[in-house]
Amino acid sequence: MSEAEARPSNFIRQIIDKDLADGKHTTVHTRFPPEPNGYLHIGHAKSICLNFGIAQDYQGQCNLRFDDTNPEKENLEYVESIKKDVTWLGFDWSGEVCYSSDYFDKLYEYAIELIQKGLAYVDELTPEQIREYRGTLTEPGKHSPYRDRSVEENLALFEKMRAGEFAEGQACLRAKIDMASSFIVMRDPVLYRVRFAEHHQTGDKWCIYPMYDFTHCISDALEGITHSICTLEFQDNRRLYDWVLDNITIPCHPRQYEFSRLNLEYTVMSKRKLNQLVTEKLVTGWDDPRMPTISGLRRRGFTPSAIREFCKRIGVTKQENMIEYSALESCIRDDLNENAPRAMAVLDPVKLVIENFAAGTVETLTLANHPNKPEMGDREVPFTRELWIEREDFREEANKKYKRLVLGKEVRLRGAYVIKAERIEKDEQGNITTIFCSYDPETLGKNPADGRKVKGVIHWVSAEKGVPAEFRLYERLFTVPNPGAADNFAETINPESLVKVQGYVEPSLVEAKPEFGYQFERMGYFCADNKDSSPQALVFNRTVGLRDSFVKIDEE
């Protein structure tokens, strides 16, 4: 397969291919420009994979630029978490990290240029009045009474804004475009506002801050961005993007292209709604494994390669659509099935005693870490007289379809012997407390000598050598596919989205590294929690089941 065939094709790449073929550009330069006012989520991952992926495939560059023009909502914690997430996803930015605040001096100069050209003015309408004067989709706006101030007056007033002589909301700088435009974004948009807030990069140097639409296009141009790629909600803003660059003296004029944002079933990605989940303690934090944040997915056990594959599979289009959550689960399931070592864990234990196995004896069995990858090696698993098995793997009576342990019948223990359930003990409530079995010592790694068929295989953990563990069984956070459309999305939270159970794991898992994925045989894919797990108190998060657990729910 050629390099071109290996690349995922989409309309943006077709534009880039044409630009390069026509000689419009000789190289490709993209950027990923998050605002450092929150944690990145799976929707941002789509943009990261697109922008950094394009730069990689075309041997170009991609900048990481923080759009830090709103100091009241931004801080260094978000800056560091975003850098960590981008790196974790497998990407590296070109050169140093960029900040829009790096260009505050330049932006101020460009604002003065617009004033000097009669294309910007200082307005003293209140924010409420500005909204009122803006008009509606069906009615044009009306001019501010301050719109026709002279250039000299506007320059003097803008300098006073910078000097801190206006209170917040008392004055702003607006572009002079067209109050009757059919695009509301072009009705004299605000370019600068007064904010007496300390900035995490520039300190208290500034008390006026540029708006996103003024900053974004100029930052792109100053960095030499060739293709400015953003989501569809900025489609109308492209007119303002071009207007600003057309009316200032700047050598580079990037072009903006829009694609559809990611909409994923059974989750929300609105920053406001995610913040509500955290502040109302409906989840444990931004890195709760049920959250769609990169940090939450990482803690749950999602791998960078699975997220990149998901972004590749869903593609890049201009059409808004809802992606099935199972598509994301399929990517991590495929990844871990291929790469995760196997281990055994019992989540709902009942004791099994092999009466003809010598008490106090520990037999060390050797089990493969992966059934199809001998290069992943083996592990030693202790086998003892007393074991734990899953409660659901035993029945007193069952039909022929039940391929697990039944009273009076045989089953094979994974990687070990054939056993037969001989009798049981129950407590006063009728619950089975112990299953007493016999084992066939001639069946380790081979079938019974007399040719009898034993079809079922169940997993187990030594009761004497196994290690206690907590298992956090995560499911989708919401019960409806589109919780964001509900009147109160919080009422659609799935009460079964987290169930905690206590069980046992084989001893090799004591040293399990946080976030490293395992297949717990027959139970699903799990990883040690990166906050709460320790060798002294193991905590495993279920990343995803062996199959889609919601299929049955949907069918019902």
Swiss-Prot record:
The keyword Cell inner membrane does not apply. It comes from Vibrio cholerae serotype O1 (strain ATCC 39541 / Classical Ogawa 395 / O395). Belongs to the class-I aminoacyl-tRNA synthetase family. This is Glutamine--tRNA ligase. Keywords: Aminoacyl-tRNA synthetase, ATP-binding, Cytoplasm, Ligase, Nucleotide-binding, Protein biosynthesis. The gene is glnS. ATP binds at residues 35-37, 41-47, 231, 261-262, 269-271. Monomer. A motif ('HIGH' region) lies at residues 34-44. Transmembrane segments: none annotated. It comes from the Bacteria. It catalyses: tRNA(Gln) + L-glutamine + ATP = L-glutaminyl-tRNA(Gln) + AMP + diphosphate. InterPro entries: aa-tRNA-synth_I_CS, Gln-tRNA-synth, Gln/Glu-tRNA_Ligase, Gln_tRNA_ligase_bac, Glu/Gln-tRNA-synth, Glu/Gln-tRNA-synth_Ib_cat-dom, Glu/Gln-tRNA-synth_Ib_codon-bd, Glu_tRNA_lig_a-bdl. L-glutamine binds at D67, Y212. Its main location: cytoplasm. The lineage of its organism: Bacteria, Pseudomonadati, Pseudomonadota, Gammaproteobacteria, Vibrionales. It is found in: Cytoplasm. One of its GO terms (biological process) is glutamyl-tRNA aminoacylation. Pfam families: tRNA-synt_1c (PF00749), tRNA-synt_1c_C (PF03950), tRNA-synt_1c_C2 (PF20974). GO terms for molecular function: ATP binding; glutamine-tRNA ligase activity. Its EC number is 6.1.1.18. A motif ('KMSKS' region) lies at residues 268-272. One of its GO terms (cellular component) is cytosol.
